[in-house]
Amino acid sequence: MAVTESIASSGFPLGFKFRQGSSRPAVITGAGHGCFVAEARHFSAHHQKEAIVTEGEHGSSWRMTSDEGLHIKGDNLAPFPLGFFNAGLQADLAQRIRGLAQARGMTLSSLTLSCVTGYSMTGSFFQGNGVGAAEPAVIHVYGEGPVHAQAFFALVNEAVAASPALASMTQPLANTFALYLNGQRRGVTILPASTAPSAPDPLKTYSAPPAPLPGSERDLIVKTGITREGPIQIATPAAQPGAPIVRHVEGHCVTDLASGDSVTKICLQLPGMSEFALRTSTNGKDRAPSGLALLSAGVVFCYMTQLSRYIDYMKL
C-alpha cells in the first residue's frame, strides 16, 4: 500500500536546521555577494511542500515547510508562500537597521516593523490569459531610543538602500529557466533558458527526507493559534469579468536588538486565516535562517503552488 507523505507524517518541526555550514555569506549582514539555493518538493498531500534553503557556498541549510489555507483547499498546517516573502522583507530590513545603528554608534532600545504586501490577478490562470501583479510593499518602522527623529529617518533610508530583499521589488530581474524530466535536462522553448550548468538530481542528492540536526532549534516556524475573525470563504472567480482578485498579507516583526533574532508574525487578510510566526537570526551563532533565506523559500513555494494548481486543473 502506498504511503501518503505529509508535513505531519514526519513528526518534525515546521522548520529546522538541516545542515551546518562553516560561515554565513557576507550579504546577510552587510555588503557582499551570496548565492542562495532553494530546493523544494511537493508532498502527496495537495498544497503541502518543503524546501531546503542553503545560505551561500559555505552557509547552513534550513528546511522549511509551506501549505495553503482552507480557502484554496489546503490543510493550513504551515505558512503560505506569500507569507514567507513578507516575513523575509521585514527580517532583512530589520537586520540592516540594527547593523547600521551599531556601526553608527546609535542606541536603540526597541525596533519593530509592520508590512503589508499586496498581490492581484486578472484573467484566468487556467485559460492561459492570467496576469499577475504585485503592489508596492507598505512598511512602517518603529524605533525607540535616545536618537533624533531625523537621524533615525536617515538610518532607515540607508538600510532600505542596503537591503537585497527590498531590491528584489525595485530592480527588474531577468529570470531564466531549466526543465528536467526523469533526471534529464529538457529544452525550454517559451521561457528564457538558463545557461547555468545542470542542477544535481535531487533524487540522488537526498537519499532520505531531511531531519533536524541534533540540538537544533524547534521553534523557527510555529502556528500561533490565532485566527482572523469570520468564517473561511472558499476562493471563487472575480465577481465581474476582468476584475482583479486581490490578496493582502499582513506581517509584524519584532527584533531583539541584543541577540539579533527577529520574530515575524504573518497572516493573510481574509476571514478565518491562521497566523504563523517565523524566527530569523543574523548573529554568528547561526540559530535561525536569515530574512533572505525566508525570501528565497517564498519564491520557490509560490512557483510550486501554481504548478500544482495547474496539474490539478489539467488532471495530469
Regions found by a protein language model. Give the residues of each.
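Extended beta-strand/beta-hairpin segments
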Residues: 2-87, 98-297, 304-316
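Alpha-helical metal-binding/catalytic segments enriched in His/Glu/Asp
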Residues: 89-93, 302-303
